[in-house]
Curated annotation (Swiss-Prot):
This is Cellulose biosynthesis protein BcsQ. ATP binds at V9, R10, G11, G12, V13, G14, T15, T16. The gene is bcsQ. InterPro entries: Cellulose_synthase_operon_BcsQ, P-loop_NTPase, ParA/MinD_ATPase. Keywords: ATP-binding, Cytoplasm, Nucleotide-binding.
Amino acid sequence: MAILGLQGVRGGVGTTSLTAALAWALQILGENVLVIDASPDNLLRMSFNVDFVHQGGWARSLLDGQDWRDAGLRYTSQLDLLPFGQLTSQEWENPQAWQETLGEIGSAIQALKASGRYSWILLDLPYGESPLTRQLVSLCDHTLAIAQVDANCHIRLHQQALPAGAHILINDLRIGSQLQDDLYQVWLQSQRRLLPIVIHRDEAMAECMASKQPLGEYRSDSLAAEEVLTLANWCLLHDAGDKTSAGSLR
């Protein structure tokens, strides 16, 4: 099994929707998947038909001294969700007070990996370098850095470090945009970790969260859903290749 983290090069690049879409695609391919919201924004739940008023989550449980396992939700027989949970306004104002407490989730994720219950654990990681985020990134076997082809992300790719070994995944690529086409050609020449897969702009991606469903469940025939399914297959092949390479060294 593998732990896969998805993190935006900046905020607002569609990381949460992509995480939900990839989780759905992997379970369509027969994988057992746990998707974990690691962002205090607590938005991943909205892609899995969880009530807006639901405040529970692994972080909320740890902060309240409860068992984080009780926060897990079943979506399909092969797809489970672990929301972050809702923070209070006081907790938002003083994140240093709870970062250490939430660090306990690291050992929990390692135990889940060791159990073999899931083929994949997907982490929806927030943008930034908080202590908790750094800890979770260090647990990942693979990391996808999500970027949109714009000047903002172009600058960031040259001035901020990506997680070690991260692959860059382009999201929301617009057909007919001269600027995006120009930047994309530059990236093809300069970004060696660029994935050979892109996710094109698709209205279904925006609509699926409004419908509280993962992309592939909402519109399996959409272009973006087909591209995410291709991404899921790439993840399976890439993970299998890494394990084969590791085994050959022993």
